[in-house]
Amino acid sequence: MSQENVEVIRRAFEAWNAGDMDTFRELCDPGVIWRGPEGWPEPGPYAGREAVMRQVEQLRATWDSDSFELISDFFDVGERVAVRFIWQTAGHGPESNLELTGVYIVRKGRCVAIEFFWDHAEALEALGLSE
């Protein structure tokens, strides 16, 4: 099952980078929970697909373009999948290259939880692993 979970998250990244928010939305469970990294400017968590998609729309509207560049392989522990990436943004908002690690819980082909970490080691600890 874990390789299928990795594929769900891979498809979500591909959809985001292609601007295909319909596919991204469908890969999120109706009850998905999104938690930003510590110190993120917008309060959270966001509970439910509609709240998550409103946050996504708000984030994406901040810049003319944004994309995720993977800087690690996907790895999985049971129903959880993690990947390290750089979120590159450009345009009318401040340009940035934010390095994050995302930890995702996937059930029945949909993402039910998303949590982001600035510190990769902290993300691994959340998975019960270490660097």
Language model feature labels by segment:
Residues M1-E131:
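C-terminal and inter-domain tail/linker signature
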